């Protein structure tokens, strides 16, 4: 009977984790460059004889690789990335990756995010431009030109998020594994004058949220019933002495 409680508890913990990720996804359905968090669950077998009992793992989080819709803005300092790559930014918590390409220039010409975090080049250094040196043009390879002269290169990075990651400021993420600059990949490029919208389908996520909430309530009710049955069994056994 206790085994049933353990199985229900493992299911409840897994469902709670999925509820939290769904709620976070929905909250960021309008966040530029946001990538949804998904959860993969595995079946864990308990070595109980004479039969094996299946438990639900707590779940492993991973980032959705689906690209969000592209929105044309026409701004010279708005950028979207084509393909599986990220911009690198220097946050107070350390370097982070983002697909939110809403950039601007400081008074000194440093390229920063709308929150003021420096945007980094392929070498991990801040990008310095001249705000008064003419039109800014950025090629698909990330090369930044002013008056026909290349003066900087937007850093594009790839990372293995399967080794773990943490969120930073909604659309930014910090992978556990060291990101590497993108080299010789023709499927990756920069699009100037565009932004990538969140890849969250709010309607789909809401539907899943309702389903998971119902499942969570059902498991909770099952646990209460199991606990009640266990109490009655203990009471009966105790009274038979």
UniProtKB/Swiss-Prot annotation:
Q: What is its main location?
A: other
Cellular component annotations (GO), alphabetically ordered: bacterial-type flagellum basal body, rod
Keyword tags:
Bacterial flagellum
Any Pfam family matching the protein: Flg_bbr_C
The answer to whether UniProt assigns keyword Membrane to this entry is no
What's any GO biological process attached to this entry? bacterial-type flagellum-dependent swarming motility
Q: Where located? A: Bacterial flagellum basal body
- Superkingdom, according to UniProt? Bacteria
The record's section on InterPro entries has: Flag_bb_rod_N (IPR001444), Flagellar_FlgE/F/G (IPR020013), Flg_bb/hook_C_dom (IPR010930), FlgE/F/G-like (IPR037925), FlgF (IPR012836), LlgE_F_G-like_D1 (IPR053967)
NCBIfam families per the record?
Answer: FlgEFG_subfam, flgF, PRK12642.1
**How does this protein assemble?**
The basal body constitutes a major portion of the flagellar organelle and consists of five rings (E,L,P,S, and M) mounted on a central rod. The rod consists of about 26 subunits of FlgG in the distal portion, and FlgB, FlgC and FlgF are thought to build up the proximal portion of the rod with about 6 subunits each.
Family classification: Belongs to the flagella basal body rod proteins family.
Q: What is the official name of this protein in its record?
A: Flagellar basal-body rod protein FlgF
Native organism: Rhizobium meliloti (strain 1021) (Ensifer meliloti)
């Amino acid at each position: 009977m206790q085994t049933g409680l353990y199985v229900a508890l493992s299911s409840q913990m897994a469902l709670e984790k999925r509820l939290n990720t769904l709620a976070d996804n929905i909250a960021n359905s309008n966040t530029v460059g946001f990538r949804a968090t998904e959860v993969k669950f595995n079946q864990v077998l308990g070595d109980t004889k004479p039969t094996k009992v299946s438990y639900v793992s707590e779940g492993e989080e991973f980032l959705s690789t689906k690209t969000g819709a592209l929105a044309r803005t026409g701004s010279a300092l708005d950028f979207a990335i084509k393909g599986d790559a990220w911009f690198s930014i220097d946050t107070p918590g350390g370097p982070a990756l983002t697909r939110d390409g809403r950039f601007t220039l400081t008074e000194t010409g440093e390229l920063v995010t709308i929150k003021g975090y420096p945007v980094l080049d392929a070498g991990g250094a801040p990008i310095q431009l001249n705000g008064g040196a003419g039109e800014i043009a950025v090629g698909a390879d990330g090369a930044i030109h002013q008056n026909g002269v290349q003066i900087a290169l937007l850093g594009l990075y790839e990372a293995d998020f399967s080794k773990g990651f943490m969120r930073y400021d909604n659309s930014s993420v910090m992978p556990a594994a060291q990101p590497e600059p993108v080299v010789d990949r023709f499927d990756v490029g920069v699009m100037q004058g565009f932004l990538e919208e969140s890849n969250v389908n709010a309607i789909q996520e809401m539907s899943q949220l309702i389903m998971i909430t119902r499942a969570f309530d059902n498991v909770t009710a099952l646990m209460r019933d199991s606990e009640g049955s266990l109490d009655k069994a203990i009471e009966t056994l105790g009274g038979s002495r």
